[in-house]
Amino acid sequence: MATVLSQSEIYIALVVAAHAAILALRLSVSLYRS
């Protein structure tokens, strides 16, 4: 890796990515069932 990230930045990035994935899944499921 070219840039060295701190553990807190990596943790925040993982949390944001997880929330985005969960929101996308819930949205697709709700659209699929309607």
Curated annotation (Swiss-Prot):
Family the entry assigns: Belongs to the PsaM family.
Species this protein is from: Synechococcus sp. (strain RCC307)
Keywords: Membrane, Photosynthesis, Photosystem I, Thylakoid, Transmembrane, Transmembrane helix
Protein name: Photosystem I reaction center subunit XII
Membrane topology, from the record: Single-pass membrane protein
HAMAP family, A to Z: PSI_PsaM
UniProt-annotated location(s): Cellular thylakoid membrane
Domain of life: Bacteria
Keyword Membrane found: yes
Transmembrane stretches, start-end: 10-32
GO cellular component, one term: photosystem I
GO BP: any one term: photosynthesis
Pfam families: PsaM
